[in-house]
């Protein structure tokens, strides 16, 4: 569930952005953007020239120079406004997070148990390693791990999701976030961070942009823009002696106007806004990125590692069939499977009980009256079951049951081996049931592949992105599900070490890898991946290892993260193409206006039929400023994203933004020229 989206132009944000745009007119603020600093310097110079002309210190048209100066200042202001508006949207999102932070007191325990003596201390004084007791109705005062107890927790202030979640000691659901509220019961929490380092603090800092640094692609593009600016600066500087030698020197005002129109001011003015807006869009998807670098890396990803359960399949495997061993009837198998599952609260365990009831009317037994000993599932044993009336019933993975049978002096039947293989080939997960050393048969657990997922993978394949399914299932089951889902490859019987090795293998081939994870055992792979989306419901170790956190804890979100990253890169590339293509029309407007008096042959370049040299220069400068305002919505929302191959995407952008960058200025400059003529300003 995503939090409330801000309108693109909220009135409150517009007013604040206008104020911030004026504040950014200082030289120190402008120096951060070399392209716009040149425009700022040109604005200052033409302002001084206007004042000198008004006071009669130098000759020239004060009106013409003044209008040029005014629109150069507008160009700087519009660029500042774009950046301030993007930052304002992020700050508004940060302010909503700040509302979660409350000054509160915490019960700091003197020993790590719920009945230990407690001291009431301000939450801000809690340090890493402190133990606190939190009861129903309390705000959790710090990020940490639950070491005792279990409780229902309202995380809506962080995630936007109204449904409460369970947090309890042990397992992958022990991580809690400061600022969330306990609805019932109590928790003993070990604080895992110091003041100012909480997840909420980091979220606020990231969203506000306090930690925003330019990404590698942004730096590379900035260097390109600086290089183009230097080239045009040198070219413009040589035009004055060139025109003076011809007997009619071009004025400094015209040269400044020419320089500003030729340098890539459009992308220069919007570049910062695009980066800030990319992180803001990521937050709109309920994903917190640690930096713009992470968002950018998401756009460059070409390998996705996707967990099968919850991402590719619905994640609620259901018992679909009982397949007895030779000499065993199906009812006997169903009865044993149901007994072994009575204390199994997993969806799979409950589905086995229900299937036995539906098939053979085997009613669920009263657990208390059985006087049985239940054997829980563990990662080591990989099986669970029940000991009742001298009967020892177990269900589990094929390998685990085989070891169990052989250790009890039995043998694993060949017909059951064949049944296991048949179930796996159909994409189901086989569980084997055994009583003592006698194998009774196989339970087929069927997981459903999500609707539409195959089409999404086909779109990713068009974009050159390889999809790899990660699963703990055996190779046959994994191969069947992979074929049904349409992924490019799979890793079966996955372990943390195998995932880490796979990521390193792809990276050694020069690929960028993205993955999701929520457990402590995922932390090494998350730390190695280029884009690592940790689930908010996961452990502290997983969240610290990732460079993004999904507040919705939805593994499928990884695909959306890649889309947002690619959209940011496409927006930057498209507007750069548009900005550079713009120069052609401005060239046809200003060059004839500036030099036709010296070289009449250049009038042939006035293909737009502009009214006069002054109107041509004014029209180009005004268009140069206004186009920034018109492109702000595109910079903030991002260009329309379509899953295409790199070559198809390049062709599309060249047609839309390259050709558009050529045509739009011709039309815009001509329209402005006509208006200036009608107003008598030409």
From Swiss-Prot:
The active site is at residue 307. SUPFAM superfamilies: Calcium ATPase, transduction domain A, Calcium ATPase, transmembrane domain M, HAD-like, Metal cation-transporting ATPase, ATP-binding domain N. The chain crosses the membrane at residues 34-54, 58-78, 219-239, 254-274, 588-608, 616-636, 662-682. It catalyses: K(+)(out) + ATP + H2O = K(+)(in) + ADP + phosphate + H(+). It is a multi-pass membrane protein. Mg(2+) binds at residues 518, 522. It is found in: Cell inner membrane. InterPro entries: ATPase_P-typ_cyto_dom_N, ATPase_P-typ_P_site, ATPase_P-typ_TM_dom_sf, ATPase_P-typ_transduc_dom_A_sf, HAD-like_sf, HAD_sf, P-type_ATPase_bsu_IA, P_typ_ATPase. Keywords: ATP-binding, Cell inner membrane, Cell membrane, Ion transport, Magnesium, Membrane, Metal-binding, Nucleotide-binding, Phosphoprotein, Potassium, Potassium transport, Translocase, Transmembrane, Transmembrane helix, Transport. GO terms for molecular function: ATP binding; ATP hydrolysis activity; magnesium ion binding; P-type potassium transmembrane transporter activity. Belongs to the cation transport ATPase (P-type) (TC 3.A.3) family. Type IA subfamily. The system is composed of three essential subunits: KdpA, KdpB and KdpC. Part of the high-affinity ATP-driven potassium transport (or Kdp) system, which catalyzes the hydrolysis of ATP coupled with the electrogenic transport of potassium into the cytoplasm. This subunit is responsible for energy coupling to the transport system and for the release of the potassium ions to the cytoplasm. This is Potassium-transporting ATPase ATP-binding subunit. It comes from Salmonella heidelberg (strain SL476).
């Amino acid at each position: 569930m995503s939090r409330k989206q801000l309108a693109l132009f909220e009135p409150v944000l517009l007013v604040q952005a206008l104020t911030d745009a004026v504040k950014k007119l200082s030289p120190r603020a402008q120096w951060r953007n070399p392209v716009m600093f040149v425009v700022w310097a040109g604005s200052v110079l033409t302002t001084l020239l206007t004042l000198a002309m008004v006071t009669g210190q130098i000759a020239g048209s004060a009106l013409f120079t003044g209008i040029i100066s005014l629109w150069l200042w507008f160009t700087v202001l519009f660029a500042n406004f774009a950046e301030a508006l993007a930052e304002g949207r992020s700050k508004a999102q940060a302010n909503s997070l700040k509302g979660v932070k409350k000054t509160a007191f915490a019960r700091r325990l003197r020993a790590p148990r719920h009945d230990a003596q407690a001291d009431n201390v301000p939450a801000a004084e809690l340090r890493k390693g402190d133990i606190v007791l939190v009861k129903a109705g309390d705000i959790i005062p710090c990020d940490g791990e639950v070491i005792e107890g279990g409780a229902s927790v309202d995380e809506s202030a962080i995630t936007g999701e109204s449904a409460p979640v369970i947090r309890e000691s042990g397992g992958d659901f022990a991580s809690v976030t400061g600022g969330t509220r306990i609805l019932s019961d109590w928790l003993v929490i070990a604080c895992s961070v110091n003041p100012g380092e909480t997840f909420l603090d980091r979220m606020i800092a990231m969203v506000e942009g306090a930690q925003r640094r330019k990404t590698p692609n942004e730096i590379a593009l900035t260097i390109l823009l600086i290089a183009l600016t230097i080239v045009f600066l040198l070219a413009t500087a040589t035009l004055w002696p060139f025109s003076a030698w011809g007997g009619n020197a071009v004025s400094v005002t015209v040269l400044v106007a020419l320089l500003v129109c030729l340098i890539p001011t459009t992308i220069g003015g919007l570049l910062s806004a695009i980066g800030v807006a990319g992180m803001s869009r990521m937050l709109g998807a309920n994903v917190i990125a640690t930096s713009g670098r992470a968002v950018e890396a998401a756009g460059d990803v070409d390998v996705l590692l996707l967990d099968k359960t919850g991402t590719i399949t619905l994640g609620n495997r259901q018992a679909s069939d009982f397949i007895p061993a030779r000499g065993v009837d199906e009812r006997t198998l169903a009865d044993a499977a149901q007994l072994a599952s009575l204390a199994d609260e997993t969806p799979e365990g409950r589905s086995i009980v229900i299937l036995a009831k539906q098939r053979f009317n085997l009613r669920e037994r009263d657990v208390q009256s059985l006087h049985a000993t239940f054997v829980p599932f563990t990662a080591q044993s990989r099986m669970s079951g029940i000991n009742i009336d001298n009967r020892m019933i177990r269900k589990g993975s094929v390998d685990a049951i085989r070891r169990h049978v052989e250790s009890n002096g039995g043998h694993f039947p060949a017909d059951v081996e064949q049944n296991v293989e048949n179930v796996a080939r159909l994409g189901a997960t086989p569980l084997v049931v055994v009583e003592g050393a006698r194998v009774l048969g196989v339970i087929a657990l069927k997981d459903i592949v999500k609707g539409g997922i195959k089409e999404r993978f086909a779109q990713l394949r068009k974009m050159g992105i390889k999809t790899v399914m990660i699963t703990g299932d055996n190779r046959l089951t994994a191969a069947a599900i992979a074929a049904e889902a349409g992924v490019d490859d799979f890793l079966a019987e996955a372990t943390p070490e195998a995932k880490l090795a796979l990521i390193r293998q792809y990276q050694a081939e020069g690929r960028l890898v993205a993955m999701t994870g929520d457990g402590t055992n995922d932390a090494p792979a998350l730390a190695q991946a280029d884009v690592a989306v940790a689930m908010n419901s996961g452990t502290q170790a997983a969240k610290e290892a990732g460079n993004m956190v999904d507040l919705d804890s939805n593994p499928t979100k990884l695909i959306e993260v890649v889309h947002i990253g690619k959209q940011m890169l496409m927006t930057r590339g498209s507007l750069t193409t548009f900005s550079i293509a713009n120069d052609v029309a401005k060239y046809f407007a200003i060059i004839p206006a500036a030099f036709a008096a010296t070289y009449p042959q250049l009038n042939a370049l006035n293909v737009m039929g502009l009214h006069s040299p002054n109107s041509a220069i004014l029209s180009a400068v005004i268009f140069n400023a206004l186009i920034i305002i018109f492109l702000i919505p595109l910079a903030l929302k991002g260009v329309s994203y379509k899953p295409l191959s790199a070559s198809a995407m390049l062709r599309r952008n060249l047609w839309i933004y390259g050709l558009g960058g050529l045509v739009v200025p011709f039309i815009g400059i001509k329209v402005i020229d006509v208006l200036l003529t009608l107003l008598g300003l030409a």
